[in-house]
């Protein structure tokens, strides 16, 4: 079939297998060009491995550190007449390139919040790797079924305490949109923490430790975003921020148990704002990202997922002098938070109108990166060619 982008709101409901493969190859080429990372992990579990930062971590571990990787994700395969998800095609491409390099790659498709998928993962580690020495936690999900109670929690993107006047960019109509977001109820806050907080990360590490599949001295990190004051009302001080603060709490107990396990470590890693399927769903992020791209590109400091994660590995996860803040988080977002960058973004934020969107922002760059997520708009891909949407992932365990 011939596959074209079909965008509905903040999601593209189609994905292109050849485009996704080219996108993965581009990230691999970046890591290969930057060169090997010293003292890197050799057996890595990536929870949330198919898109965005999780995929970038899997690529960096494999092609930067020479690691064998086991990836967990929840994606839909293509079938005749219907494309699969971009994460499915990304993972198929990753497997293909890892095999060419002689690297072990296995993946598990299913709900990472469930006990069943945790057990399948443990079994795969025991059978193939023995143990893992690094665990990356990069799940982005709008809902979670609690594995012990069966209760279904949904995350909510709302401020806490007071209503917030929100400025955003309607990406369909290409207009600036002002809206009012009502505050979250306590129940909505609790549910968001249940989905996006640190409980599942802790459950994963506890399960892996109990099963004896974490090597002594193993490290784990969960990815997060903090942002600056422009995004704080809706993000850090909102319902999602409550979940992110829960990560900061849960990491303390995880760090303690890993430290007792041969001197291991657990850290929250703070990464910059990028275009992902998760971030495009946040009302103000398309406008913020379009402005941020413009300012950072002009400064020559613009980075995407792979650049961020490669530097996180090289400088902090595997380096001798990690970028660490007072709370003990690893920081890779310092170029975004440069006061000069934030001041310029704030000034443009107040000036942007329907008439000057393309002048004051890099909305063109935002749209391009958004389509790239789904394998569209990639140089060298023939989008008029007939492609088979049914792409198999070798070494896949279906949960």
UniProtKB/Swiss-Prot annotation:
InterPro entries, A to Z: Eno_Rdtase_FAD-bd_dom, Enoyl-CoA_Rdtase_cat_dom, FabV-like_NADH_b, Trans-2-enoyl-CoA_reductase
The protein's Enzyme Commission number: 1.3.1.9
Feature type site, description Plays an important role in discriminating NADH against NADPH: 75
Location of the active site: 235 (proton donor)
Record flagged with keyword Oxidoreductase: yes
Gene3D superfamilies from the UniProt entry: NAD(P)-binding Rossmann-like Domain
Any one of the GO BP annotations: fatty acid biosynthetic process
Keyword field: Fatty acid biosynthesis, Fatty acid metabolism, Lipid biosynthesis, Lipid metabolism, NAD, Oxidoreductase
Binding site for substrate: 225
Annotated binding of NAD(+), by residue: 48-53, 74-75, 111-112, 139-140, 244, 274-276
Superkingdom classification of source: Bacteria
Pathway(s) per entry: Lipid metabolism; fatty acid biosynthesis
GO MF annotations in UniProt: enoyl-[acyl-carrier-protein] reductase (NADH) activity; NAD binding; trans-2-enoyl-CoA reductase (NADH) activity
Keyword Nucleotide-binding carried by entry: no
Catalysed transformations (reactions): a 2,3-saturated acyl-[ACP] + NAD(+) = a (2E)-enoyl-[ACP] + NADH + H(+)
Residue ranges that the Swiss-Prot or TrEMBL entry lists as coiled coil: none
HAMAP family reported for this sequence: FabV_reductase (MF_01838)
Family listed: Belongs to the TER reductase family.
Stated role: Involved in the final reduction of the elongation cycle of fatty acid synthesis (FAS II). Catalyzes the reduction of a carbon-carbon double bond in an enoyl moiety that is covalently linked to an acyl carrier protein (ACP).
Subunit structure: Monomer.
Protein name per the record: Enoyl-[acyl-carrier-protein] reductase [NADH]
Organism: Yersinia pseudotuberculosis serotype O:1b (strain IP 31758)
């Amino acid at each position: 079939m011939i596959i074209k982008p079909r965008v509905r709101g903040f999601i593209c409901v189609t994905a292109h297998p050849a485009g996704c493969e080219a996108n993965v190859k581009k990230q691999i080429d970046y890591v290969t060009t930057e060169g090997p990372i010293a003292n890197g992990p050799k057996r890595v579990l990536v929870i949330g491995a198919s898109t965005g930062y999780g995929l970038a971590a899997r690529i960096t571990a494999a092609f930067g550190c020479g690691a064998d990787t086991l990836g967990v994700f929840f994606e839909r395969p293509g079938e005749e007449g219907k494309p699969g998800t971009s994460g499915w095609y990304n993972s198929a491409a990753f497997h293909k390139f890892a095999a060419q390099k002689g690297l072990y790659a296995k993946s598990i498709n299913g709900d990472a919040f469930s006990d069943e998928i945790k057990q399948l993962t443990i079994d795969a580690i025991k059978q193939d790797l023995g143990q893992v020495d690094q665990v990356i936690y990069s799940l982005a999900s709008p809902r979670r079924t609690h594995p012990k109670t069966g209760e279904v929690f949904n995350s909510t993107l709302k401020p806490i305490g007071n209503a917030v006047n929100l400025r955003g960019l309607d990406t369909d109509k290409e207009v600036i949109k002002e809206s009012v977001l009502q505050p979250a109820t306590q129940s909505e806050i609790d549910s968001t923490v249940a989905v996006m907080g640190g409980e599942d990360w802790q459950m994963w590490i506890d399960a892996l430790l109990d099963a004896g599949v974490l090597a002594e001295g193993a490290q784990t990190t969960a990815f997060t975003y903090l942002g600056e004051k422009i995004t704080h009302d809706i993000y850090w001080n909102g319902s999602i921020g409550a979940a992110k603060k829960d990560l900061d709490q849960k990491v303390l107990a995880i760090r303690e148990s890993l430290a007792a396990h041969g001197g291991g470590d657990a850290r929250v890693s703070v990464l910059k704002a990028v275009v992902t399927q998760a971030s495009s769903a946040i009302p103000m992020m398309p406008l913020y990202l379009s402005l941020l791209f413009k300012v950072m590109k002009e400064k020559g400091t613009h980075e995407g997922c792979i650049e961020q994660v490669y530097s996180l590995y090289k400088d902090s996860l595997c380096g001798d002098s990690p970028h660490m803040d007072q709370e003990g988080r690893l920081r890779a977002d310092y170029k975004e938070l440069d006061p000069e960058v934030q001041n310029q973004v704030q000034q443009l934020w107040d000036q942007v109108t329907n008439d000057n969107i393309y002048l004051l922002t890099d909305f063109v760059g935002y749209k391009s990166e958004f389509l790239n997520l789904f394998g569209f708009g990639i140089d060298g891909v023939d989008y008029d060619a007939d492609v088979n949407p049914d792409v198999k992932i070798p070494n896949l365990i279906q949960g």
